[in-house]
Structure formats: structure tokens, C-alpha cells
UniProtKB/Swiss-Prot annotation:
GO terms for cellular component: cytosol. This is Probable transcriptional regulatory protein COSY_0365. Transmembrane segments: none annotated. Keywords: Cytoplasm, DNA-binding, Transcription, Transcription regulation. It is found in: Cytoplasm.
Length: 246
């Protein structure tokens, strides 16, 4: 249980301040356009669109900006064709890194990712080289809430696990197949999560020292900052004492 909490804190600790707000919004717009093109503009029938819109709103993106992005996707006003491409590699101390991207130019994207890995002591590898070190699963986070009610609704809906943390937050863990059903069931029961996503959780972690952490953070920040990057996952274990120095 503690491991999952640590993983989530590491992945989201720096949050929005890692990247300029304009770049974050540009990425949301791209994801909204693609989700709309793929599943339609009716949010009730398109869980992927609902997810990205929720994330955009949580980042304080304006509703009219979101609506314009949906319009661009539904009316084919954006003529670019995007591919979902995953890149895998290694950071310092053998840490495993996954970079999920949305790109309209694979050559540009791989060149930028390779440059980031090389600049900060990493190595871009081949497909499948590190993904086996992670488990794909659904993650639903409640910063506060009625633990008993959340547990009852989530488990009845098919959740794999419920994790309660010392700070009062509650994590609901699901399979990828059941994620949207369980999330919608919780929302219908008026249990609104503060954050939810389908993510990649490391099976094991690699502990980093202060020296390695500095270059590792520069690497992951550089990867996150790329225009084509959607998500960056890793299995680094960075202590609270070290992370507070950055």
C-alpha cells in the first residue's frame, strides 16, 4: 500500500509547475481533438473525451477553449493525423522510463526523445524493453471522502483494491477494462474523485541517490516538456528528503 502511495506522489509531485501552462493546454487541446475524432463529441458516450476534459478543467483550462477543441475534432477542422506511439528507455542507475506520445511526425518525436535521453545520461531502447516492468491499471483518487461508502461502492462495482493513506486520501485500483465503469458508478453515487486515470504502475522500484536524482529529474522534466509527450512513467524511488532539495 505504501508503495502505491509513493509511486503516485513521485509521478504527480511536481505537477503543473513542471511545464509552462501554455504547453499543458496545447497538449490538452490535441488530446481533446483526437478523443472527439475517435469517439464523437457526446461526452456521455465518449469516456476518453470525458477523462481529458476533466483533466483540463482541473488544470483551470477555460470551458470555451475546451468547447472549441471539441468543435475542431467533431467538424474535422484539424487536418492532422496523430499516432499514439510509446517509447521506452533507461535513465541513470537502470531506472525504467516509458514515454507515451501523440505525434503527427514520428521522425521528429523520436529525435527529440533520443536527444533528451542522451543529454541526461539515459538511453532510448526498443519497444518492450521496459514496459514489462510496469502494470497497466486504473487509478481513482479521492483526496477526502467517506472511506466506508467509497469502499462499498467501488468493491461492488468490481474494484481490485482500495488503499487508504495516513493523510486521509483514498485510492481505488481497477483493471483497465473496468476503469470507466467503476469511475462512472462512483460518480453516479455522488462520489466525485479528485483525480482518475489509466496508468502504468511499476512492479519494483530503483532507489536514487542525490546525485542521480538531479540528472533524473532533468531527464523526466525534459521528456514531459516535449510537445508530443502525453505521459511519462518511471520506476525511480526518490526519498522525500532528496526531492525537497529540488
Amino acid at each position: 500500500m505504501a508503495g502505491h502511495s509513493k509511486w503516485h506522489n513521485i509521478q504527480h509531485r511536481k505537477g503543473i509547475q513542471d511545464v509552462k501552462r501554455g504547453k499543458i493546454f496545447a497538449k490538452f487541446i490535441k488530446e481533446i481533438i483526437i478523443a472527439t475524432k475517435t469517439g464523437g463529441s457526446v461526452i456521455e458516450n465518449n469516456p476518453s473525451l470525458r477523462m481529458v476534459i476533466d483533466r483540463a478543467l482541473a488544470a483551470n483550462m477555460k470551458r470555451n477553449t475546451i468547447e472549441n477543441a471539441v468543435k475542431r475534432g467533431s467538424c474535422d477542422l484539424d487536418d492532422k493525423n496523430y499516432d499514439e506511439v510509446r517509447y521506452e528507455g533507461y535513465g541513470l542507475a537502470g531506472t525504467a522510463i516509458i514515454v507515451d506520445t501523440l505525434t503527427d511526425n514520428r521522425n521528429r518525436t523520436v529525435a527529440n526523445i533520443r536527444h533528451a535521453f542522451s543529454k541526461y545520461g539515459g538511453n532510448l531502447s526498443i519497444e518492450g524493453s521496459v514496459s514489462y516492468l510496469f502494470i497497466k491499471q486504473g487509478f481513482i483518487n479521492f483526496e477526502t471522502g467517506d472511506e466506508e461508502q467509497i469502499m462499498e461502492v467501488a468493491l461492488d462495482a468490481g474494484a481490485k483494491d482500495i488503499i487508504t493513506n495516513d493523510n486521509g486520501s483514498i485510492y481505488v485500483i481497477t483493471t483497465t477494462e473496468d476503469f470507466f465503469t467503476i469511475r462512472n458508478t462512483l460518480i453516479t453515487a455522488r462520489l466525485e474523485p479528485s483525480h482518475s486515470e489509466v496508468t502504468m504502475k511499476p512492479i519494483n522500484y530503483i532507489k536514487l541517490n542525490l546525485h542521480n536524482t538531479e540528472k533524473f529529474i532533468k531527464l523526466t522534466d525534459s521528456l514531459k516538456d516535449l510537445d508530443d509527450t502525453r505521459e511519462v512513467y518511471h520506476n525511480a524511488d526518490i526519498s522525500d528528503e532528496i526531492i525537497t532539495q529540488f
